[in-house]
Amino acid sequence: MSDNSVGIIGLTRQYPEFRYSTKEMIDVLGNKLTEKVKENILQLGVENRYFVRPLEHYVNKSSKQIKSVPDGEPISDLCKNVGEKCLSDLGLTKNDVTCIVAAFEDNDFLSPGLSSILLTKMGLSKFIPHYNIQGMACSTLPKLLELGKNLIRNKNDKVLFVISGCNSGWYLP
């Protein structure tokens, strides 16, 4: 749009069920982390982290890493719920969405990307443009907003952004 009147009209958030303080996570991981890694984690300033499954699901007492269960991480379910709530809060319908952009660190599967999964789970048209930006949610936000601004061509365009900052156990020692 030429008049630069592009803006964010609503925000909705939802957290996964399992919340852990950074200290709790360090305690659970015990001697699997070096002192330098522990110090780095504490200096990040993140007080709480949220997981889609209990932390114990990913870490056990042996040195064997526990993999995700066959149904994958239910991250797309959380994203679907928050996307639908956002539309409802704004008084929009699924037919109002002209594009979806999903940003995520972790996804249910390696492929397809989260936006493709959300099209199906939310019942959106499979013919609307949809994009994935993979990376840490904090670093993908600026790119997501830049892309979104460039996708809006007229006042009727409604781009749904879904940003997942869900932690999964894939990176735990």
Predicted feature residues:
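Acyl-thioester C-C bond-transforming condensing/cleaving domain
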Residues: S2-D3, S88-K94, D108-P173
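Conserved active-site "lid/cap" helical segment
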Residues: S2-T98
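Cofactor-binding loop segments of dinucleotide-utilizing enzymes, especially the Rossmann-like FAD-
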Residues: L11-R13, E105, S164
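Generic, well-ordered alpha-helical segments
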Residues: K67-C79, D106, L110, M136, ...
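Short glycine-rich or small-residue beta-strand-to-loop segments that form or flank ligand, phosphate
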Residues: T98-E105, N132
